């Protein structure tokens, strides 16, 4: 079972490896705005729990278990961003809102949000209808 903090690290490591082909402690620390010693401590825990393989001074690689979870965590994050965009959340608020909610939703809830996103993506008129409803509730009496 992963904690929210472990998930943040796995997600970031997965994204760095996808983007650069590798993830160093310094890159992870910079991306998460934490001290490198905190990264080393967490990486050692993730190694012990078999999410990655870490060799001091040599770098790290995600295990198949780590890759699977990393991919799912990135999907969750991107899906929630997409959902918040569809429902009209201000762009500058989306990242922090996703960070605030992503660890508190069950995978069942994530899957249902995915269904809802798909529903809106399948037919552009549904998005327009939602915007129309939002306009009415924001400006009652118009």
Curated annotation (Swiss-Prot):
The keyword Isomerase does not apply. GO terms for cellular component: cytoplasm. Disulfide bonds: none annotated. Gene3D superfamilies: Iron dependent repressor, metal binding and dimerisation domain (1.10.60.10), Winged helix-like DNA-binding domain superfamily/Winged helix DNA-binding domain (1.10.10.10). Its main location: cytoplasm. The keyword Signal does not apply. Mn(2+) 2 binds at residues 11, 77, 99, 102. Mn(2+) 1 binds at residues 8, 99, 102-103. GO terms for biological process: intracellular manganese ion homeostasis. DNA binding is strongly activated by Mn(2+). Transmembrane segments: none annotated. SMART domains: HTH_DTXR. It is found in: Cytoplasm. Keywords: Activator, Cytoplasm, DNA-binding, Manganese, Metal-binding, Repressor, Transcription, Transcription regulation. It comes from the Bacteria. Residues 1-63 form the HTH dtxR-type domain. GO terms for molecular function: DNA binding; DNA-binding transcription factor activity; manganese ion binding; protein dimerization activity. Belongs to the DtxR/MntR family. Homodimer. Central regulator of manganese homeostasis. NCBIfam families: PRK03902.1. This is HTH-type transcriptional regulator MntR. It comes from Bacillus velezensis (strain DSM 23117 / BGSC 10A6 / LMG 26770 / FZB42). The lineage of its organism: Bacteria, Bacillati, Bacillota, Bacilli, Bacillales.
């Amino acid at each position: 079972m992963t904690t929210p903090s472990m998930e943040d690290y796995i997600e970031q490591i997965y994204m760095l490896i996808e983007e650069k082909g590798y993830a160093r402690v310094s890159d992870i620390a910079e991306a998460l705005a934490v001290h490198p010693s905190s990264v080393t401590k967490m990486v050692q825990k993730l190694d012990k729990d078999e999410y990655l393989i870490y060799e001091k001074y040599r770098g790290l690689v995600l295990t198949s278990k780590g890759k699977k979870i990393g991919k799912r965590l990135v999907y969750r994050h991107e899906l929630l961003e997409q959902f918040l965009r569809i429902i009209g959340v201000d762009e500058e608020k989306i990242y922090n809102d996703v960070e605030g909610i992503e660890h508190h939703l069950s995978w069942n809830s994530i899957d249902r949000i995915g269904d809802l996103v798909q529903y809106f993506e399948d037919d552009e008129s549904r998005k327009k209808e939602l915007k129309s409803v939002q306009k009415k509730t924001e400006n009652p009496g118009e």
